[in-house]
Amino acid sequence: VVLGYYPEYWVLNSNLALQPAANIVGFAQRYPQSAMAEKLAADYIEEKVKMADFASAQPVLAYVSNADRAESCAMAQVRAKSGDPLVFAEYKDVWLTTNSQPESCTGLGRMMLSSPLMTEQDKQQRLWAQLRAGQSGQAIATAQTIGMNLSLAQLNSIQADPLNYLWSAPKASAADQAYLIYAIGRLADSDLNTALASVKRAAEGTPESVQKALY
């Protein structure tokens, strides 16, 4: 059996994105629990997600049990598109991470951002994480989904001299508080001790959730 499936595997794999789902499912059913069937199914899902053909990927999900990070995010996109309401809660780490991650996970994050299932508080947490990490472009996009307009020019000017900004930073509005979090993050990048010394003053008079984000 082992050698028997290689020729069939290569034929399917050579133009994987063009295969109907039934071909992949058929292979997986003929060679259950085999590494090649698992790989073929996982690769197929990733290819279909890249093409935004979520419907074709859907029947193949059941045949992947040991997905890596990129495959797992691709599968999550398919589940989300089919209306699975639990998927986003399972992938909160993708939502909040600021580390580089596979394209399928970045895509899942974008999908979450436009989903009505993510609350304003969820989006605020993502925004603050991106601000702390200095991801200004992504932070601006996240902020827009909660009706907050952050200025790239302002973020750049804070980045150039965060300590100077913190001395007289306004704190009244949600956007002010976002700039504050960004400024503390940039100061911590360059001078952690000064940032630690400045954070108490920066946090004074802000809501408790903002204070937590600052610290």
Please annotate each region the language model reported.
Residues 1-215:
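Alpha-helical solenoid repeat scaffolds
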